Curated annotation (Swiss-Prot):
Source species of the chain: Samia cynthia (Ailanthus silkmoth)
GO MF annotations, alphabetized: growth factor activity; hormone activity
Keyword terms: Cleavage on pair of basic residues, Disulfide bond, Hormone, Secreted, Signal
Subcellular location: Secreted
Protein name: Bombyxin A-2 homolog
Gene for this chain: SBXA2
GO cellular component, one term: extracellular space
Family per record: Belongs to the insulin family.
Lineage: Eukaryota, Metazoa, Ecdysozoa, Arthropoda, Hexapoda
Alphabetized InterPro entries for the sequence: Bombyxin, Insulin-like, Insulin-like_sf, Insulin_CS, Insulin_family
Length: 100
């Protein structure tokens, strides 16, 4: 019951705002917004992976995880928390996480 009330409040707040301003969404609020924006179907957006386990690292004797840790050129993986909790994001950015 409490979750339903929270969900309803968030939905009404989003509908009332009507604009696409950026907001910070964290924790349960982020999950609730994803469910609302994505119509209950969302997925985790992941960067493409290298197909071969050690391809591209040049350190074939190291395990994949250790080689990835040593690879300084590799950028930080961005996810929904980085995009919407650590900094404000818009509904359009949230839509990028919806299942297509």
């Amino acid at each position: 019951m409490r979750t339903q009330v929270l969900f309803l409040i968030v939905v009404l707040a989003v509908m009332a705002s009507g604009d696409d301003t950026a907001h910070v969404y964290c924790g349960r609020r982020l999950a609730t917004m994803l469910l609302y924006v994505c119509d209950n179907q969302y997925q985790v957006k992941r960067p493409p992976y290298i197909s071969s386990e050690n391809e591209g690292y040049g350190w074939k004797w190291l395990e994949r995880q250790r080689a990835r840790q040593l690879d300084e050129a590799r950028g930080k993986r961005q996810g929904i928390v980085e995009e919407c909790c650590n900094k404000p994001c818009t509904e359009n950015e949230l839509l990028g996480y919806c299942y297509k």
